[in-house]
Amino acid sequence: MLKRFTRYVTQSVAGMIGISVYVLADTFFISVYSGADGLAVLNLILPVYGLIYAIGAMIGIGSATRYAISRAKGKNTEHYFVQSVTWSILAAVPFMLIGIFIPDKALALLGADAGLIGLGRNYVRIILIATPFFMSNYTFTAFARNDGAPSIAMIGSISGSIFNIIFDYIFMFPVGLGFSGAGLATAICPIVTMSVCTIHYRSSRNHVGFHWKKPSFRHLISCCQLGVSAFVGELSSGVIAIVFNFLILGIAGNMGVAAYGVVANLSIVAFAIFNGLAQGAQPLISESYGKGQPTQVRKLLKWSLLVCLAVEALIQLIIWTSTDTLISIFNSENNVQLLNYAHTGLRLYFLGFIVAGINIVLVAYFSAVDELKIAIVGSFLRGIVAIVICAVILAKLFGLDGIWISLLTAETVTFLTILFLAYKDRNRIE
C-alpha cells in the first residue's frame, strides 16, 4: 500500500503543479510584456480563476469521490462521469455570457481602473468563454485518477502546461497577440489535458461508464457534498485575492497589488502541492473506507500528514533562502518598490503554509470518509470566514504586514477548530 500511496501522491502533486503553471506561465510572460500593470491586471483576475476552478473541482472531484466509494461498495456507477461533465458545462454558461457581453464590468467589479480594463479586457473575455473546458478538465483528471490511472492524469496535466508555456510565448510575441495570446494559450490548455486523459477512457483498463442519464439535481448534491472541500480549497485563493486586493489598494495602491500578485502566484504552487497530496491520497482513503478497512484508513492519514510536514519544511527553506530570486522572476523592470513590498510579503504570507498544508489534508481526509460536517466547517473556515475576518482586523491593526500575516492566523484558527470537532465526535468517527 505504501508503494501505491507514493505513486498516487507523487503523480497527483505533479499534475496539480502542472495545472498551477496555467497561471504562472501567464504571469511570467505578462510581466515581461507589460510590467507592473500587467501583474496588477492578472492579480485582479485571479479570483475569476479561483471561482471557475472551485466549481469545476466541486463537481468533478466530488463526483469522482462518490464514484470511488460507490464502486468499492459494488454499486452502479455507469452514469457518474457523464453527469459530472453535463453539470460542469451547465455551470459554465453564466461565465461564458459574462465573457461575451460584459467583460469590462466584470473587471471593474474586481477593482480595475480604466487603464487596467483596457489592458485586460480581451484576456478575461477569452478565459470566461473557455470556462466549460476548465471545469470539465477536473472531471476528466479526477475520474482517471480514481479509476486507477493517476499517471495518465499527471501526464495530461503536465502536457497541457507544457503547451501553455510554449504557446504563451508564441502567441504573445512572434504572433503578436499580446495579452490576448496569453489568454488563448491558457484556454487551449485543458483541451490538451482532456485529450490525454481520453487515452485511459478508451483503454481496456477503463471502468468508467459513459451511459447517458437525465441530469439529476439530487445526484449533483450528493456528489458536491463530497466536493465541498475541493471547492473551498480552490475558491480560497480567489476569495483571499479579492479581499487582499481591496485592502492592499487602500494601503499601497497598484504597486502593492502588483507585489501581492507575485506572492499570490507563488502561493498557487504551494497550494497545488498540498491539494495534489490531498487529492492523491483521497481515492485510496475512500476505497479503504468503502471496503470497511479502518486500520488502512488511519495509516493513509498518517502517511499523508508526514509527507505534508516534510513539504512544509522544504517550502519554508526555499522561501527564506531565495526570497529575492523568486521575486526577480516576475520583476522584469527591477522595480525597487515592488521588490521591497514583495520581499516582506512573501516571507510573512508563506508562514501560513506551516498550518495550511495540514488543514488541506485533514479536510480532504474527512471528506473522503464521508464526515461531511467537519470537512465543510473546516473548508469554509479556512477558505472564506477566518481569512476574511483576520485580514480585515489585522490590516487595521498592523497595516500591510497585518494582511501578510493573516493567512497564518486564519489557518491556526481553522486547525484548532478541526481538532475540537474531531475530538468531540471521536467515538462516532472511530
Regions flagged by a language model, labelled:
Residues 12-61, 65, 130-134, 221-287, ...:
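Transmembrane helix-bundle signature of multi-pass secondary active exporters and lipid flippases
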Residues 39-97, 134-146, 150-152, 259-317, ...:
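Small-residue-rich hydrophobic transmembrane alpha-helices
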Residues 27, 36-39, 150, 179, ...:
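Membrane-helix interface/capping residues of multi-pass secondary transporters
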Residues 99, 142, 168, 172, ...:
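Structural signal for membrane-spanning alpha-helices in multi-pass inner-membrane proteins
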Residues 23, 27, 31, 99, ...:
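Juxtamembrane/transmembrane-helix interface segments of polytopic membrane transporters
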Residues 60, 126-145, 153-164, 182-197, ...:
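Short runs within selected transmembrane alpha-helices of multi-pass transporters and secretion channels
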Residues 24, 33-36, 70, 146-147, ...:
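Helix-loop interface residues and adjacent transmembrane-helix termini in multi-pass membrane transporters
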Residues 1-13, 67-130, 177-228, 285-352, ...:
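Short alpha-helical transmembrane segments in multi-pass integral membrane proteins
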